Amino acid sequence: MEENNDSTENPQQGQGRQNAIKCGWLRKQGGFVKTWHTRWFVLKGDQLYYFKDEDETKPLGTIFLPGNKVSEHPCNEENPGKFLFEVVPGGDRDRMTANHESYLLMASTQNDMEDWVKSIRRVIWGPFGGGIFGQKLEDTVRYEKRYGNRLAPMLVEQCVDFIRQRGLKEEGLFRLPGQANLVKELQDAFDCGEKPSFDSNTDVHTVASLLKLYLRELPEPVIPYAKYEDFLSCAKLLSKEEEAGVKELAKQVKSLPVVNYNLLKYICRFLDEVQSYSGVNKMSVQNLATVFGPNILRPKVEDPLTIMEGTVVVQQLMSVMISKHDCLFPKDAELQSKPQDGVSNNNEIQKKATMGQLQNKENNNTKDSPSRQCSWDKSESPQRSSMNNGSPTALSGSKTNSPKNSVHKLDVSRSPPLMVKKNPAFNKGSGIVTNGSFSSSNAEGLEKTQTTPNGSLQARRSSSLKVSGTKMGTHSVQNGTVRMGILNSDTLGNPTNVRNMSWLPNGYVTLRDNKQKEQAGELGQHNRLSTYDNVHQQFSMMNLDDKQSIDSATWSTSSCEISLPENSNSCRSSTTTCPEQDFFGGNFEDPVLDGPPQDDLSHPRDYESKSDHRSVGGRSSRATSSSDNSETFVGNSSSNHSALHSLVSSLKQEMTKQKIEYESRIKSLEQRNLTLETEMMSLHDELDQERKKFTMIEIKMRNAERAKEDAEKRNDMLQKEMEQFFSTFGELTVEPRRTERGNTIWIQ
């Protein structure tokens, strides 16, 4: 706060006086004698200028407002005509001025003083979010945008939320007044940039009065002055023809500025919620319209005649806006179509898996389903070199002759992904399909091809293909690729219909065209799959007994066999046979370890005969018991089981480590939470103690002031008594002297 008596600037020249926030006559106390001087004050920008006269151009001084505060002085009974307020340095900030001087000002009326105090506070606290009472709605919304987009100012939302929680059933809501002193304190707190909170002890009527006060203090009401006559005409039209009046009213509402429109919509919807409890709170639509109508819609010149003429019309108009707010303020289509955020990845996986199962059921129930073809053939060498690096790359697809029009979308993201693991501990190309099923929908005349590096196998099947895996983690494919394509039953070898399957970072499988194979191969090297990327949520909840069942010799509870019955309508997984029967049976050989495959697609007849032979073999193997199957593959069981046992042990160890790590994190977070709660409780206790100390100090200050006043009164009484005593004593001493002089005895 600075006073510049030697200012050479001329703030009132040109348009300076037009840009003034407020101007008027005030009396300022100044000088060594502290006498009152009448000055012309002009509030402009962040400074308060004062002049000797209204026509003067050179200010006598300036008061720099930022960093200071303004406070009102209570009315003194001895001087009832003085309305004092003071601009003092410091405020609630750490800023202090150079001269540490305060200014005591006096207004002519109480209203004039309150207007000056509000204007000065708005200048001081405006940059800090304060001074919102009497501030333009646009300025308030513009400042609060830093906290996010809102329909209404934060003060309005805070009051509305509190009333929603505690006041909807309060009788006489918005009709009964709140505590005037508490409303004043809350207003001053908000004007000073504070954010006071309402607790359970706060009076609901006080908060309601604060909300009404904010709307009443707006420089321009929610419905601007320029729209006053237009809205009155809508009200008159409503009385004649309601439908046309509502349409015209909706048109006028849409023409409002955005901030006014949002605030009006927010208030009308809230008031409609309040009137829904009218049976308890006794506040019907008409009562609410009577209370809020003058605060929402009022004329610029509030003379008694205009107010009396427009009261009934404004009440009717406000009633319509509350009761028909759905028509006047339609919900935005964007908000309705916007997807909900915060959905977890596991829930999405479960939902997609469920959709995939429903789709499979629909495909299985189809009577006239097209034929499908499952084939196992040799993978391409470029893909083999890329897979040996340990990174999941784009998977190659077989070439088909099917036309482009016959290709339909293959949805593989609805189910948990399919992956083949190659373990060096296995004797030959031991592939393990882990974690999840692979389902797809088909159209008439389409067939499906699946390729792995372990030889060739082809069989014609119909409907959907589904492969269910184990509960183990997944690894990248080595020395081979997995692909899935759609081909026509008539032709093979057309490259126009090739689809590639690749792994994404979240564990899903995508199908891509063959022309994107190189790009997918480069991207796949950066997307290495974790051990638990493809573990389904429902598998993570299994108990220890279910996990130990993987170590069993027959592997009866977790299988990834692809069943190929010749007369079945679907090609789906079996859960009762050993996985080696399909992956290691039928003379499968690894093209890398054992040389080239024995099956070749160049001989269609041999291909069909081998396919039929393997189909019969698969059907006969499923007809036998699990003991027969174990005897058939007794040669490979020992090494495979040892490898599986080591894999399961490593996975269990990793899960145990993760469990210990997560438990330690949880314990540390809980400990931190307890520490913070203890600190918060101590801070609350300290705050309560400080509040009690402050209250005690206030009481002591008041007692001291009263004692001071009593002492002054006693001093005055003593002074009067002493004066009276001295005057009386003086008269008594003077009269005897005069008597002695009059009775003088002369001695001769």
Curated annotation (Swiss-Prot):
The coiled coil domain mediates the interaction with FLNA leading to its recruitment to lamellae. One of its GO terms (molecular function) is GTPase activator activity. The modification Phosphoserine is found at residues 369, 391, 396, 398, 402, 413, 415, 437. Phosphorylated by ROCK, leading to activate the RacGAP activity. GO terms for biological process: angiogenesis; cell differentiation; negative regulation of Rac protein signal transduction; negative regulation of ruffle assembly; signal transduction; wound healing, spreading of epidermal cells. Residues 617-641 have a biased composition (Low complexity). Keywords: Angiogenesis, Cell junction, Cell projection, Coiled coil, Cytoplasm, Cytoskeleton, Developmental protein, Differentiation, GTPase activation, Phosphoprotein. Its main location: cytoplasm. This is Rho GTPase-activating protein 24. It is found in: Cytoplasm, Cytoskeleton; Cell junction, Adherens junction; Cell junction, Focal adhesion; Cell projection. The modification Phosphothreonine is found at residue 452. Pfam families: PH, RhoGAP. Changing residue 175 to K: Does not abolish the effect on actin stress fibers but moderates its capability to induce membrane protrusions.
